[in-house]
């Protein structure tokens, strides 16, 4: 039905107006007032004169007469509100309307009839949801979403959901919910793939701990999802990181964000089966790119070359013949959305228009400056470019006369004004532009037209206009832009001359929509008429009544001509190796084309190749002498595989898409032979510097998931400002510059690497869970505590559970009623609840492997007595809603350390410290130290390590200032019994100890001992010496320096290598080793009698876990592990420098790199804690005392590819097994282990390469190294264990019977097996007599059935008989040896044969009483029943959170 005026649609009016001798019809339809965010949408059709209109109110209208009259498109009493309208790109009679309720209306007859597809509830359909099949119009994919309403905190959560249909939505199937989106492989008419039903889908790998797109893979799907195949871009990552897939011309292009480098990479396919990576030679770091429309043979890609707010790009073309991207044009114009001013013209082969930025240097200085755009054109697919010639009748004035050209508005701005290529009119170009040195704004532009593919131009209309044309250029239409007018212009001769017609109402044009059907000559002009959006329909059929004639055999006789794109002196010329022509309507004739006429090119002649038909090949570049010379850098990917290779290369190649035939014996067709050049890769290192007007207090790296260099860096300055960087310090931005808050600190989440809390002085918390890309501003419940407790405590199982240690009444200077308070949040700080006031400090007990209630809290509770020392340790599992459970009184502190909960407490008389341990969070047992070690109240514990199923603690035995040292003790597996493993170990007055485990090697540690403890106690300066252990503290030895005599010829055998340890490190987080570079250890020290001062020290390295050491620098250096140790970086630490050194061969050789012009004193060499980044921060002291210079050194371009790990082909990695100084593989914890490291010299970076970090080759036979001394035993010279004087052997019945499933216990020996050893067989030192555990007697006797009495009697008789025989034989032999014997005292070297014999026999005879003892116990076990005893509760194992802590009675400690 027709709408009436009350519905804001007026009845269509027709006027027949004779204007300028021309006749035309027009009609105006008003559509009401549109909002700023909405506009009407028009869809017209190629096979009918129907038009669909979606107006701003969501009403869908249909016209069947070219827009003259309108009616409801969908016949419904309650028409749906339509929000989106889409037309099928390959069958334009099919249209889809998306309603506000996300239902789909489908029409297959140009809008005449519709059917409704009702979508499931909660479906959301956003923009561009459809994917179409170019060969099967009924096959459609719908990429939608399902949305769920969440809490106020989470909001609405939407998940991708994809549907597909093979009958145009009559039947609809959904895919698996892990599918992100799908597309058809046959997405373009040009695509040549054979499988018409193939779909390509992005699938989310839910078991991969990465964020999108790194958890997305590309899969190939057959019809109906009957089969699914994963696309493989990388042998290990598959297609992880796939961002999107698009169909462009004959190509499928997949954009992949590399998991390692975080750079964007492209892969293409021409059949949907085989994918080829595109290689960009000497391209900028790819962070954003745009795939442009391809030619028939090539693919265009524009890569963003800057990260400016006003971006600039580089244009490349790719050929399937070699998959190399060749740079064709620099400084292309881009916008922040990714749109690019590079356009290939329709209906014209190899012709490209592009806008370039002429003032790029100015943009670097100030990104907000206006770009100066210069238009260029290429007629050979981008190989050569020229500027546009201005119309001959237009000139520039003054200084601009020499550089006066025509410049055009192209893709970024021009598309809304009109199309560059008129419909089916080869060689004609229309565009708005200006004449001058660069492009002027649209308001100062005119309409220009070229009829010869851009070689010459003429001014068509002055001022900016909207413009369009009908098919084949029968009529051009234009209206003025940006001003009100009543005139509509039209031209029948390609815009040379224009006529005008006038309408009654003044309008302001917004768009011209040309007719799509050859049966129509009606143009629609979308315009504002009296502030109402309207459409003006103009029908030119009355002035173009004659139909054009076309005879394919006699073209010249009709209304078409043969048009040649390149003509000189009226003679067609070779272009791209051929003479070709197009069929084009003659300009001078007035007629309308009603039937299709071919618009493709026709080849008339193939030409012989000339110089212009060649370009430099991939590895060559043009020289100033018009020849192609090799580019050594481009050969790098080839030569790094084999640096000594001889290459066969062709310097020239025929242009892509060129058809010429080479001449015989053409020199440009010949190959040359050349050796790989030697390259200096230092120029592949990128450096950025930034001046920070402050000193640095702390740097936090938020690594998150994915590629190593995708970190966000948060920096806290000494003036309490926070800076952040998204590019590893290339640029530092100040946090919340306008409000300028002061920060207490930065607190990274302990279990979520992309989450952190920033606490301000005004009690605000800035919370991020996306690596600082955005922040939530929250309220802190109170100021932070003032006594040094961790402000935030995080839950390992529930990341949103956060504990806050705050304070009350601590604002005044007297702190009279100042106290600590504890708050809990279950929503990452959005809300807080306060725990009871008497709680001083709390911690979650749940560790990584501790199987306790996740609500379990341990807290220090203040004691009632004001003068009391320590706290009451209490526990709660309901956040103190009920009475807390008391654990122990007089507690000084507690600590979670891997598998242990450790309590330090005062004894009841407050005279000494006691330590208690639990491995289940419930039951605590006292720690029993060796009898000769007592810990008094003035002494202290330092928890050192707990990684190897044993607690290492340092017990202070001397706390005199300047003479602090103590003993390192090691516990059994449940932390209760301790043995002394090293005496006189150095510590400082803060409690830190010179004891450090080697990362990645579980049994190796370094320690410094005080060599002159007595003298140091009496006031002399401590002299330190360094020792190393390879078996977890059992044995210690000196360090071995390679070529020590060569470097230190005057140092005798008393000299050894000593290192400055943990206590002297300025930045405690700086590691001497890294688990990412297993076996590589750095040290600063001296080869001397004892450790020399730091300033005179040297730098050493070990590549084999500390077995051998090598001198690398003659002065102290700082170091960093880059890319998992495949790159080592060092910089002098005591002198000013502008040089850093890097090594690609594990420190065997070093390359100097100058990172600055001036010299600086380096304060820190910093990189991400994981050690697998390829960037480092060099932090230097500035010229001013309160100034820091940050240098970012980027090594990511130093290598050309990612390392590949393959067990069967270890070309990039080599296995390394720790070995002793004799070269034999070392058994660490009872097994030989192979670690994999990148081979020195391999041209690859590790990044996140999924390689096996370590592999157990085989278990070893047990040796003495697999045993440690039992409690109350000490190791003596020779490695044996003896009972400490005055001590008793440990009673282990309770401990052994407490183990899960224990049936028996064994009497102690002097040895016990190391908990982590996996050795098998060999030496057994920890077995002795067994007894049944209480209550397990029946089970015990099933395992050890009683020995028959007759066997016992036989064993006794046999022992007596053997003893008699052996004794008689010894006596006889001794008599013969004694004849003529002479005794020479006690010298063992002169021991007599008899003595030697007796030594051997003694071992035999001694076995007799042992044998009898065994027999006795067998007898006893038959008749005697063991006494019953109490058993301990079983212990569960868990891992805690921290690796070291210092517990001390600060209030009562005094100096001795």
UniProtKB/Swiss-Prot annotation:
Residue ranges crossing the lipid bilayer per the database entry: 1349-1369
Gene3D superfamilies: 2.10.70.80, 3.30.60.270, YVTN repeat-like/Quinoprotein amine dehydrogenase
GO biological process: Golgi to endosome transport; Golgi to vacuole transport; protein targeting to vacuole
Cytoplasmic side: 1370-1456
Glycosylation-annotated residues: 44, 330, 349, 974, 1135
Entry keyword set: Glycoprotein, Golgi apparatus, Membrane, Protein transport, Receptor, Repeat, Signal, Transmembrane, Transmembrane helix, Transport
Residue ranges annotated as Lumenal topological domain: 23-1348
Pfam families to which the protein is assigned, alphabetical: Sortilin-Vps10, Sortilin_C
Membrane-topology descriptor: Single-pass type I membrane protein
Sequence similarity: Belongs to the VPS10-related sortilin family.
Described function: Functions as a sorting receptor in the Golgi compartment required for the intracellular sorting and delivery of soluble vacuolar proteins, like carboxypeptidase Y (CPY) and proteinase A. Executes multiple rounds of sorting by cycling between the late Golgi and a prevacuolar endosome-like compartment.
Name of protein: Vacuolar protein sorting/targeting protein 10
Lineage, highest ranks first: Eukaryota, Fungi, Dikarya, Ascomycota, Taphrinomycotina
Gene (UniProt): vps10
């Amino acid at each position: 039905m027709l709408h009436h005026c009350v519905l804001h649609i007026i009845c269509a009016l027709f006027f027949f107006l004779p204007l300028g001798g021309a006749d035309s019809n027009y009609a105006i339809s008003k559509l009401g007032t549109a909002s700023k965010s909405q506009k009407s949408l028009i869809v017209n059709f190629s096979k009918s004169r129907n038009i669909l209109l979606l107006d701003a109110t969501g009403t869908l209208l249909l016209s069947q007469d070219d827009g003259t009259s309108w009616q409801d498109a969908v016949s419904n009493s309650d028409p749906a509100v339509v929000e989106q309208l889409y037309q099928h790109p390959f069958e334009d009679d099919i249209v889809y309307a998306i309603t506000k309720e996300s239902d789909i209306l489908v029409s297959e007859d140009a809008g005449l009839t519709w059917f409704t597809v009702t979508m499931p509830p909660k479906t959301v359909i956003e923009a561009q949801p459809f994917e179409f099949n170019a060969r099967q119009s009924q096959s459609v994919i719908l990429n939608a979403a399902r949305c769920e309403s969440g809490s106020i905190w989470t909001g609405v959560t939407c998940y991708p959901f994809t549907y597909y249909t093979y009958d145009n939505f009559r039947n609809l199937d959904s895919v698996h919910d892990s599918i992100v989106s799908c597309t058809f492989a046959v997405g373009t008419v040009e695509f040549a793939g054979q499988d018409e039903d193939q779909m390509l889908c992005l699938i989310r790998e839910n078991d991969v701990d990465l964020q999108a797109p790194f958890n997305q893979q590309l899969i190939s799907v057959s019809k109906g999802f009957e089969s699914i195949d994963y696309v493989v871009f990388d042998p290990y990552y598959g297609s992880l990181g796939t961002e999107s897939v698009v169909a462009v011309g004959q190509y499928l292009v997949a954009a992949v964000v590399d998991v390692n480098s975080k750079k964007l990479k492209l892969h293409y396919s021409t059949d949907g089966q085989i994918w080829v990576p595109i290689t960009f030679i000497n391209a900028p770091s790819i962070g954003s790119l745009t795939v442009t429309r391809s030619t028939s043979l090539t693919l265009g890609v524009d890569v963003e070359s800057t990260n400016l707010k006003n971006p600039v790009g580089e244009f490349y073309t790719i050929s399937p013949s070699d998959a190399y991207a060749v740079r064709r044009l620099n400084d292309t114009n881009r916008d922040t959305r990714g749109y690019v001013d590079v356009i290939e013209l329709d209906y014209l082969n190899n012709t490209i228009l592009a806008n370039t930025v002429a003032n790029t240097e100015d943009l670097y200085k100030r990104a907000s400056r206006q770009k100066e755009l210069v238009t260029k054109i290429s007629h050979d697919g981008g190989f050569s470019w020229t500027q546009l010639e201005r119309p001959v009748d237009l000139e520039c004035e003054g200084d601009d006369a020499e550089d006066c050209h025509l410049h055009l508005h192209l893709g970024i701005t021009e598309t809304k004004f009109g199309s560059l290529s008129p419909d089916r009119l080869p060689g004609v170009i229309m565009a708005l532009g200006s004449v001058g040195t660069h492009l002027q704004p649209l308001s100062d532009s005119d309409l220009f037209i070229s009829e010869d593919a851009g070689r010459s131009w003429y001014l068509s209309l002055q001022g900016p206009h909207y413009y369009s044309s009908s098919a084949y250029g029968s009529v051009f239409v234009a209206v003025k832009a940006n001003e009100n007018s009543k005139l509509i212009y039209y031209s029948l001769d390609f815009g040379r001359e224009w006529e005008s017609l006038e309408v009654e109402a003044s309008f302001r044009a917004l768009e011209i929509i040309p007719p799509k059907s050859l049966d129509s000559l009606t143009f629609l002009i979308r315009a504002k008429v009296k502030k109402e959006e309207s459409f003006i329909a103009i029908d030119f059929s009355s002035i173009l009544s004659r139909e054009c004639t076309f005879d394919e055999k006699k073209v010249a006789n009709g209304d078409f001509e043969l048009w040649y794109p390149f003509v000189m002196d009226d003679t067609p010329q070779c272009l791209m190796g051929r003479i070709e022509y197009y069929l084009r309507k003659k300009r001078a004739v007035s007629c309308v084309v009603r039937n299709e006429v071919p618009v493709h090119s026709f080849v008339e002649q193939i030409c012989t190749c000339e110089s212009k038909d060649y370009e430099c090949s991939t590895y060559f570049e043009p020289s100033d002498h018009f020849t192609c010379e090799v580019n050594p850098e481009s050969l790098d990917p080839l030569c790094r595989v084999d640096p000594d290779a001889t290459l066969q290369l062709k310097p020239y190649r025929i242009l892509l898409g060129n058809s010429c035939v080479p001449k015989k014996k053409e020199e440009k067709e010949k190959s040359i032979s050349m050796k790989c050049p030697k390259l200096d890769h230092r120029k592949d290192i990128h450096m950025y510097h930034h001046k920070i007007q402050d000193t640095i207090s702390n740097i936090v790296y938020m690594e998150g998931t994915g590629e190593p260099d995708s970190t966000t860096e948060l920096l806290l300055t000494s003036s309490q400002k926070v800076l952040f960087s998204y590019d590893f310090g290339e640029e530092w931005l100040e946090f919340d510059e306008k409000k300028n808050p002061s920060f207490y600190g930065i607190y990274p989440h302990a279990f979520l690497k992309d989450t952190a809390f920033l606490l301000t002085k005004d009690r605000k918390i800035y919370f991020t869970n996306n690596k600082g890309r955005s922040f939530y501003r929250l309220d802190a419940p109170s100021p932070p505590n003032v006594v040094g407790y961790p402000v935030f405590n995080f839950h390992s199982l529930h990341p949103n559970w956060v504990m806050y240690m705050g304070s009350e009444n601590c604002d005044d200077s007297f702190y009279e009623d100042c106290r600590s308070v504890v708050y809990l949040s279950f929503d990452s700080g959005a809300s807080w609840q306060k725990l009871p006031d008497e709680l001083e400090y709390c911690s979650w007990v749940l560790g990584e492997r501790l199987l306790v209630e996740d609500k379990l809290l341990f807290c220090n509770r203040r004691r009632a007595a004001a003068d009391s020392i320590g706290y009451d340790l209490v526990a709660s599992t309901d956040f103190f809603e009920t009475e807390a459970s008391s654990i122990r009184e007089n507690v000084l502190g507690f600590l979670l350390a891997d598998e242990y909960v450790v309590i330090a407490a005062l004894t009841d008389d407050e005279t000494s410290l006691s330590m208690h341990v639990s491995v289940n969070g419930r039951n605590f047992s006292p720690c029993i130290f060796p009898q000769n070690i007592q810990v008094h109240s003035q002494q202290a514990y330092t928890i050192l390590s707990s990684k190897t199923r044993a607690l290492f603690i340092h017990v202070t035995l001397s706390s005199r200032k300047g003479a602090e040292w103590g003993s390192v003790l090691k516990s059994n597996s449940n932390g209760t019994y301790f043995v002394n493993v090293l005496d006189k170990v150095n510590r400082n007055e803060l409690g830190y100890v010179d004891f450090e485990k080697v990362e990645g090697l579980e049994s190796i540690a370094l320690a410094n001992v005080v060599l002159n403890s007595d003298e140091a106690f009496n006031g002399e300066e401590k002299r330190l010496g360094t020792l190393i252990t390879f078996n977890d503290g059992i044995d210690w030895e000196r360090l071995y320096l390679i070529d020590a005599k060569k470097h230190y010829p005057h140092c005798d055998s008393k000299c050894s290598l000593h290192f400055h340890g943990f206590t002297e490190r300025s930045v405690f987080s700086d590691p001497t080793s890294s688990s990412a570079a297993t076996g590589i250890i750095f040290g600063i020290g001296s080869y001397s009698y004892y450790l020399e001062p730091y300033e005179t020290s040297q730098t050493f390295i070990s590549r084999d876990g500390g077995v051998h050491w090598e001198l690398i620098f003659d002065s102290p250096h700082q170091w960093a592990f880059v890319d998992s140790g495949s790159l080592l970086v060092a910089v002098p630490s005591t002198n000013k420098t502008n040089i850093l050194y890097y090594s690609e061969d594990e420190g065997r050789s070093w390359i100097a790199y100058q990172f600055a012009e001036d010299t600086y004193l380096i304060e820190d060499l910093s990189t991400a804690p994981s050690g697998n980044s390829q960037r480092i921060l060099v932090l230097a002291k500035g010229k001013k005392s309160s100034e820091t210079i940050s240098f970012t050194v980027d090594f990511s371009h130093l290598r050309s590819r990612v390392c590949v790990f393959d067990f069967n082909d270890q070309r990039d990695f080599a296995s390394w097994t720790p070995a002793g100084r004799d070269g034999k593989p070392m058994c660490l914890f009872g097994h030989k282990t192979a670690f994999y490291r990148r081979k020195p010299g391999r041209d690859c970076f590790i990044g996140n390469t999924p390689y096996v970090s370590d592999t157990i080759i085989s278990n070893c036979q047990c040796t003495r190294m697999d045993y440690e001394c039992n409690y109350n035993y000490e190791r003596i010279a020779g490695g044996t264990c003896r009972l400490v004087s005055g001590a008793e052997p440990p009673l282990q019945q309770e401990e052994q019977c407490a183990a899960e499933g224990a049936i028996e216990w064994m009497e102690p020996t002097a040895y016990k097996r190391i908990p982590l050893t996996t050795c098998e067989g060999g030496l057994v030192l920890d077995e002795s007599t067994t007894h049944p555990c209480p209550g397990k007697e029946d089970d015990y006797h099933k395992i050890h059935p009683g020995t028959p009495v007759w066997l016992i009697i036989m064993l006794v008789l046999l022992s007596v008989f053997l003893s008699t025989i052996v004794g008689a034989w010894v006596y006889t032999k001794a008599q013969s040896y004694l004849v003529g014997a002479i005794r020479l005292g006690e010298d063992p070297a002169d021991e007599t044969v008899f003595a030697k014999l007796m030594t051997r026999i003694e071992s035999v005879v001694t076995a007799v009483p042992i044998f009898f003892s065994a027999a006795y116990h067998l007898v006893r076990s038959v008749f005697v029943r063991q006494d019953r005893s109490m058993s301990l509760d079983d212990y569960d194992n868990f891992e805690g959170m921290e690796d070291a802590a210092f517990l001390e009675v600060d209030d009562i400690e005094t100096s001795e």
